[in-house]
Amino acid sequence: IGIFFNFFINWITNVKNKFARKVLEFFTGIDKRAILPKYNKETFANYFQKFKKNILPKHKERKVVIYSTCFVNFNKKKTGEAALKVLHHNNVEVEHSYAGCCGMPYLEQADLDQVTKQAELVSRELIKYVEKGYKVVTLTASCGLMLKFEWPLLMPNDGIIKKLSQNTLDIDEYVMDIANKEGLVDGLKEIDGGVTVHNACHARAQNMGNKARDMLKLIPNIKLDVVERCAGHGGT
C-alpha cells in the first residue's frame, strides 16, 4: 500500500505537514516530531528484476543472494541499487529474495511467537539459495543480526536456521572479504568532501569488527569520521 500510494503517504507523514502529523499523532500515537521513512516509487524487488534483464550473463565464481529487508525493499531502494552495482561490478553473481520481514520489530515487542513464524517463513526461502552455494548478504544491520544470532538463539534445534546463520554476511563484511581475498576490481576514485559512517549497535553486536569503516578506507585519500553512539533504535 505504501508503495502504491507513496506520494500521498509521503506527503501526510512529512514533518512539515503539521496538520496531518497532529492528526496522525492523535490516532496512532506517533510523535509529530518523528521523521518517518519515505516510501519508494517501486520496490527493490521490482528494480532487481529489471536490472537482471539488462545485464550480460558471465561466469562468476562468487554467488550471493541479497536479502533486501523491509527497509531497503520499501523505503531505501537506493541502498539496494548501490549494493547490487558494486557486487556486479566485482564479478559476483547476484540473486534477490524477500519473503518477508526478519521479525526484528516483533522481537522488540517481545512477540516471540511471531518472530518464530517470520524466521521460518524467510529461512525456508533463503536456504534454497544456500544449498546451491550462495551466500546470503544483508543490507540492514538489524536484519543481519536477526539472521546470524537472534534466530539461532530462539530456534537452536532448527538445522535450517543454523545453516543459514553460518552463511549470512553483512554487505560491508562481504565486500571486505572480496577485498582481502581476490581484491576489488580496479577503479576506486577519490570522492569530494569527507564521509561520516555510523557504526550501529546492531552491527557491533555481530562481532565482525567495523567493516563499514574498513571498506570506506579503501577509497583513495578518504576523509573518514566514525560515529559510535547509539542512534536510538531501541527507543522506537
Language-model segments: residues:
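Iron-sulfur cluster-binding electron-transfer modules in prokaryotic oxidoreductases
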Residues: I1-T236
